[in-house]
Amino acid sequence: MEIAVFGGGAWGRALAFAFGEKNEVKIISRRDLNEPLKKLNDALISKGSAPIEQVDLERGLKAALYVIAISVQHLREWFQNASLPKNAKVLIASKGIEVLNKAFVSEIAKDFIDPNALCFLAGPSFAAEIIQGLPCALVIHSNNQALALEFANKTPSFIRAYAQQDIIGGEIAGAYKNVIAIAGGVCDGLKLGNSAKASLLSRGLVEMQRFGAFFGGKTETFLGLSGAGDLFLTANSILSRNYRVGLGLAQNKPLEVVLEELGEVAEGVKTTNAIVEIARKYGIYTPIASELALLLKGKSVLESMNDLIRRA
């Protein structure tokens, strides 16, 4: 089966490689991917799979299934420009909350596609590990279980993909863990110790679940791969962009400098502000996100972390 992956960043390329084991994959990106795809295609060909082919948007839209790995902040614009066919089957692999409209991913997508044709990818994974073929377990959330299973069955041998409902819980967990991951990086950067880190992540998980429950997310989603699993991975690894943002802030570097040095998108930065504004609107208690928002605006890192540990 032919699958189109939209987005040529590290995550998009990793997903193209993963789906390429069993399927013909077309990737659509504004950047030239000839060099980045070379090693991935060599690996696919060695396994007897077809190489990933970069194509234009018109050609990509002819695929049977779509995987979208576009930054959440540009997702609405992408949908507007792409003009997906009415029968599109979509798996969104972007994690975050749209800052401009304070919208979750599914809220953006429903303006352009049938909600029953939408899936959301969640769970603990890094692009750098997927392209090495290292094993992981992910969750495909959808109100349409048949479609979720269809996508799950297309994943490679090294990925265990579960099909679950609760799409709102899955996408909130995927967005919120990036916020806690920044705080986790700060905690480690300040060398506050394992006990403080455990407290931070435990309370972060509770905060994530509290926020998600307000919008109908299920507790089991936040305690599973989509929530706890992704949180524990992202908040503890140097492979995490958001964790590295926290490490940079712990060195008293201005946020602008941290992001410039990162050279990649860290969705947790903008997601933090979106969560705080949504929480304020609905009266949801989010002490970690609220304190982190102050830190991102320039509050002293030591003062912020001390206040955070006491409040959370």
Swiss-Prot record:
Residues reported to bind NADPH: 11, 30-31, 95, 127, 241, 265, 267
Pfam family, one: NAD_Gly3P_dh_N
Family named by the database record: Belongs to the NAD-dependent glycerol-3-phosphate dehydrogenase family.
GO MF term list: glycerol-3-phosphate dehydrogenase [NAD(P)+] activity; NAD binding
Ligand binding (sn-glycerol 3-phosphate): 95, 123, 125, 177, 230, 240-242
Catalytic site: 177 (proton acceptor)
EC number: 1.1.1.94
Known role: Catalyzes the reduction of the glycolytic intermediate dihydroxyacetone phosphate (DHAP) to sn-glycerol 3-phosphate (G3P), the key precursor for phospholipid synthesis.
InterPro entries in alphabetical order: 6-PGluconate_DH-like_C_sf, 6PGD_dom2, G3P_DH_NAD-dep, G3P_DH_NAD-dep_C, G3P_DH_NAD-dep_N, NAD(P)-bd_dom_sf
Subcellular location: Cytoplasm
SUPFAM superfamilies: 6-phosphogluconate dehydrogenase C-terminal domain-like, NAD(P)-binding Rossmann-fold domains
Main location: cytoplasm
GO biological process: carbohydrate metabolic process; glycerol-3-phosphate biosynthetic process; glycerol-3-phosphate catabolic process; glycerophospholipid metabolic process; phospholipid biosynthetic process
UniProt key word Cell membrane: no
Organism listed in the record: Helicobacter pylori (strain J99 / ATCC 700824) (Campylobacter pylori J99)
Pathway: Membrane lipid metabolism; glycerophospholipid metabolism
GO cellular component terms, A-Z: cytosol
Record's catalysed reaction(s): sn-glycerol 3-phosphate + NAD(+) = dihydroxyacetone phosphate + NADH + H(+); sn-glycerol 3-phosphate + NADP(+) = dihydroxyacetone phosphate + NADPH + H(+)
Protein's recorded name: Glycerol-3-phosphate dehydrogenase [NAD(P)+]
Alphabetically ordered keywords of this record: Cytoplasm, Lipid biosynthesis, Lipid metabolism, NAD, NADP, Nucleotide-binding, Oxidoreductase, Phospholipid biosynthesis, Phospholipid metabolism
